[in-house]
A protein has these predicted regions:
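Conserved ATPase-coupling elements of RecA-like P-loop NTPase cores
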Residues: 86-97
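Helix C-cap/helix->beta junction micro-motif
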Residues: 29, 103-104
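Catalytic-core regions built around general acid/base machinery
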Residues: 22, 96-103
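Structural recognition of the conserved hydrophobic beta-strand(s) that form the central parallel beta-sheet
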Residues: 106-112
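Conserved P-loop
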Residues: 1-73
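Walker B catalytic acidic pair
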Residues: 84-86, 112
Length: 112
């Protein structure tokens, strides 16, 4: 059974690097990853996730009005969801992620 994981730490504690390494590990096993961050995080560009150690990946920017269940339905098959800076999602979006875990048996890893 899938779970929703919340990994947190202080600034500079390698949360983004861990998220990107996790993405890589899933993709190495042939799994499809939906990588996202809040749209408000534009420090490295709207659709780029970059760690302080230089790891980078394209991601989806999620605005506060985005219905994550609807976006999930629009995606091709997804095996895991990874969210960076999840503390900036709305409470409703966190509930939507929980619903995806429960209904779709989809692991969700949140970093913040």
């Amino acid at each position: 059974m899938a779970q929703l994981y919340f990994k947190y730490g202080a600034m500079g504690s390698s949360k983004t690097a861990t998220a990107l390494i996790t993405k890589y590990n899933y993709e190495e096993r042939g799994m499809r990853v939906w990588l996202m961050k809040p749209a408000a995080d534009r420090r490295d560009g709207e659709f780029t996730l970059r760690s302080r150690i230089g790891l980078t990946a394209q991601c989806e920017a999620i605005g506060p009005d985005c219905d994550l269940r609807r976006r999930y339905a629009e995606h091709d098959k997804v095996d895991v969801i990874i969210v960076d800076e999840c503390q900036f999602l709305t409470g409703e979006q966190i509930d939507q992620l929980r619903e995806l875990v429960d209904r779709e048996n989809l692991p969700v890893l949140c970093f913040g």
